[in-house]
């Protein structure tokens, strides 16, 4: 923590902090985060599943997602990154409330050679483009092809991937023809602080977008 400025804030110089402390701080304030439940396949065909919350969509044209991996991550994170680099494809499944415990099982530090999809009892189905299955219980499955790997120069690696095919549970649409999704029907969870903090996405509110010029504003 930097000098106390008595302004009601704690101040941090991230460059002077231990990496574990900066991770702890940032992961506790940048939230909630969506969770990419990644299914990948190794060169021998063995499946791997692991959740990652350093994840989001970065572009719609082309449709790109980003996933952050840490060298200090558990074995699963390393296996997933290795598979993505070697095979160039994977599936991002979004996590519904009812599969939270199964997702947590796939986050364990299982040894290499363990198929976490079987360990968690997940039902899988074939994808349309990539040679990796998606999780049936997930309301959203995104088939992805590797776009770019960015080595950050620190302990992290960022994977950019192009979404080539999307699967969205039909019952989640308020109007399929207009692509209106009812988020409440997805029942997705997000990552919060600490080693086991999560949130639901059921408690939402709506604010209408404003147009310029703003009424009552000079």
Report residues per predicted region.
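Basic, polyanion-binding surface patches
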Residues: 1-218
């Amino acid at each position: 923590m930097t000098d106390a400025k008595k302004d009601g804030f704690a101040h941090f110089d991230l460059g002077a902090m231990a990496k574990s402390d900066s991770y702890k701080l940032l992961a506790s304030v940048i939230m909630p985060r969506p969770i990419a439940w990644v299914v990948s396949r190794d060169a021998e065909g063995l499946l791997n599943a692991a959740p990652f919350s350093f994840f989001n969509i970065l572009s719609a044209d082309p449709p790109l997602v980003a996933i952050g991996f840490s060298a200090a991550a558990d074995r699963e994170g390393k296996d997933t990154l290795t598979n993505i680099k070697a095979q160039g494809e994977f599936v991002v499944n979004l996590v519904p409330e009812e599969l939270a415990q199964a997702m947590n099982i796939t986050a364990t530090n299982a040894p290499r050679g363990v198929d976490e999809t079987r360990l968690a009892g997940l039902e899988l189905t074939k994808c349309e483009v990539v040679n990796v299955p998606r999780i049936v219980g997930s309301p959203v499955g995104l088939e992805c092809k590797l776009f770019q790997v960015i080595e950050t120069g620190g302990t992290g690696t960022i994977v950019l991937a192009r979404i080539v095919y999307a699967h969205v549970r039909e019952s989640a649409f308020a109007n399929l023809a207009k692509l209106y999704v009812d988020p409440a029907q997805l029942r997705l969870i997000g990552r919060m602080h600490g080693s086991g903090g999560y949130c639901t996405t059921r408690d939402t509110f709506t604010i209408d977008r404003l147009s310029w010029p703003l009424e009552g504003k000079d």
